[in-house]
Curated annotation (Swiss-Prot):
Top-rank EC class of the record's enzyme: hydrolase
Annotated EC: 3.1.-.-
Oligomeric form and interacting partners: Probably forms a complex with the antitoxin HicB which inhibits the mRNA interferase activity.
Protein name: Probable mRNA interferase toxin HicA
Pfam families from the UniProt entry: HicA_toxin
Length: 58
């Protein structure tokens, strides 16, 4: 899955996405995580799972 697709999916789940300097800041019901900003690249599965776990979406 591309990072841009994952970002759109997170936003559809209600995650607030804000731009950082070299990354995206993710917030969901008081939980926070970050994601590198490379929209054309594939997101690695361990990183995707870690972000979901940190946000409580897994």
């Amino acid at each position: 899955m591309k990072q841009s697709e994952f970002r759109r999916w997170l936003e559809s789940q209600g995650v607030d996405v804000a731009n950082g300097s070299n990354h995206l800041k993710l917030r969901f019901h008081g939980r926070r995580s970050v994601m590198p900003r490379h929209p054309c690249d594939e997101i690695k599965e361990p990183l995707r799972k870690a972000i979901l776990k940190q946000l409580g979406l897994s």
